[in-house]
């Protein structure tokens, strides 16, 4: 990088400018008027080289002078009006420490690094289109001087992939972190790689989105549901299934002992049930769980007075406990405040899934459940979109005003025993709910924590 700068000076393609930053800005001109040559533009290469080495050796103050490329101050492309390529800045570098007090500018370092790393196609977004003439000019000069070899990298521009309900500005994302609107850069609601990974997004799902979105010179917006759809598609064939009750209420089966029997101690026997780990991959085997006289069900699966089209539990209605028996609801218990505290039912004999005659009784509703005897308590974090507006910062508006107050809801759930072996980053489909991942930071076998990656359906499309 430094050798290239010295070459540009000796070849007459660069000079040291001692104007202030404000003078350089004013004299660069704008789209309506050409720039004005610096009074230092026509120094000899020898004098410029001496000055540049003084900059390198710490002989001048920060901001007192810069190295600029000598191109064309009347160019209609402002990027070609003698851009700054080196400046004085006394700041430690994470690799070289205090060895250097001059540093190259990004626009100068970028094409050189591409060439040194043998990049053939430098891909960037449309805002860099006006930078391409400078990119090509610099590489051509360095090839002429023998510092780089032909052919040079080629820069190609395409439109940015904009997702609705997402911001990608680093400054605005930093504001979310530092204002404690999120828990950190790896918060599962953040569009950072660490955030997406913690949310449960897979590399395959992100690649699939990029492939489907394609590249274009025209800017546009991709709906966030497209990303969610790609994740569902990639997880559908690989995610093991499990049952989980996110808002548990106890279901008490009053005739359990009479139908299933009791053990030697007079306690109701447990009935072992099983289900495939994955419905389309029998080679993965089956998972085991027990049903007893008490099981956990979703509070929303019971209505004392059902609405039209409600086919789950209400007094007098029959449903199937998935992978288990058919039951008939007989009523409920309530607390002093009138809230339902338990649901009551009776077991219909000879209806266990997979047994002869189990389908003799037809039901319209099938609900998931977890046994009281072997269910595991777990923290479940229900994540949603971070913003309520498709374009939170459109038109320069305050993006914080459209933060979604319901973007995170934490519930205490009960999950089936097969999840006792879940490890951080393991992904599952919780039947009827969606795809979940064991949190890579907080999950332990002793204290399970699962994050909602994506629901089974797009709820925002309603």
Regions flagged by a language model, labelled:
Residues 2-3, 10-19, 61, 183, ...:
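Basic, alpha-helical terminal appendages of large translation-related enzymes
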Residues 3, 7-173, 231, 240, ...:
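Active-site cores that bind ATP or allylic diphosphates and position pyrophosphate for catalysis
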Residues 23-29, 108-111, 178, 198-210:
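Short, compositionally biased low-complexity segments
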Residues 75-79, 149-197, 202, 207, ...:
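Flexible, glycine-rich loop/tail regions that form catalytic "lids" or insertion modules at the edges
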Residues 96-98, 190-193, 422:
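Short hydrophobic "helix-edge" motifs at membrane interfaces and signal-peptide entry regions
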Residues 115-123, 187-193, 211-216:
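Glycine- and acidic
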């Amino acid at each position: 990088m430094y050798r290239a700068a010295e070459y540009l000076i000796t070849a007459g393609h660069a000079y040291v400018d001692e104007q202030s930053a404000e003078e350089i800005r004013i004299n660069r001109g704008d789209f309506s008027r050409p720039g004005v040559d610096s009074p230092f533009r026509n120094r000899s290469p020898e004098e410029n080289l001496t000055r540049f080495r003084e900059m390198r050796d710490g002989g001048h103050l920060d901001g007192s002078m810069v190295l600029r490329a000598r191109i064309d101050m009347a160019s209609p492309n402002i990027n070609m009006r003698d851009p700054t390529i080196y400046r004085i800045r006394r700041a430690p570098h994470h690799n070289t420490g205090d060895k250097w007090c001059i540093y190259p500018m990004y626009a100068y370092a970028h094409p050189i690094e591409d060439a040194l790393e043998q990049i053939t196609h430098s891909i960037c977004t449309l805002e860099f289109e006006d930078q391409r003439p400078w990119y090509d000019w610099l590489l051509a000069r360095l090839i002429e001087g023998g510092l780089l070899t032909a052919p040079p990298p080629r820069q190609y521009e395409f439109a940015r992939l904009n997702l609705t309900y997402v911001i990608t500005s680093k400054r605005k994302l930093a504001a979310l972190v530092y204002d404690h609107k999120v828990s950190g850069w790896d918060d599962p609601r953040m569009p950072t790689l660490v955030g997406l990974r913690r949310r449960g997004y897979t590399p395959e799902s992100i690649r699939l989105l990029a492939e489907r979105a394609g590249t274009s010179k025209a800017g546009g917006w991709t709906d966030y549901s497209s990303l969610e759809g790609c994740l569902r598609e990639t997880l559908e064939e690989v995610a093991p299934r499990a049952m989980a009750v996110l808002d548990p209420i106890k279901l008490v089966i009053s005739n359990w002992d009479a139908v299933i029997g009791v053990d030697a101690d007079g306690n109701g026997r447990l009935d072992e049930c099983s289900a495939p780990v994955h419905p389309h991959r029998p080679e993965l085997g089956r998972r085991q769980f027990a049903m007893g006289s008490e099981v956990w069900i979703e509070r929303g699966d019971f209505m004392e007075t059902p609405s039209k089209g409600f086919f789950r539990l209400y007094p007098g209605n029959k449903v199937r406990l998935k992978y288990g028996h058919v039951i008939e609801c007989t009523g409920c218990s309530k607390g002093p405040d009138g809230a339902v505290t338990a649901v009551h039912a009776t077991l219909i004999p000879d209806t266990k899934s997979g047994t002869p005659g189990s389908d003799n009784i037809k039901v319209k509703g099938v609900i998931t459940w977890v046994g009281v005897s072997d269910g595991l308590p777990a923290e479940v974090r229900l994540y949603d979109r971070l913003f309520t507006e498709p374009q939170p910062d459109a038109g320069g508006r305050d993006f914080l005003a459209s933060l979604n107050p319901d973007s995170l809801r934490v519930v205490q759930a009960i999950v089936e025993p097969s999840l006792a072996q879940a490890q951080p980053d393991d992904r599952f489909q919780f039947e009827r709910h969606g795809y979940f991942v064991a949190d890579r930071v907080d999950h332990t076998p002793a204290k399970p924590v699962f994050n909602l990656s994506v629901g089974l359906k797009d709820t925002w499309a309603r």
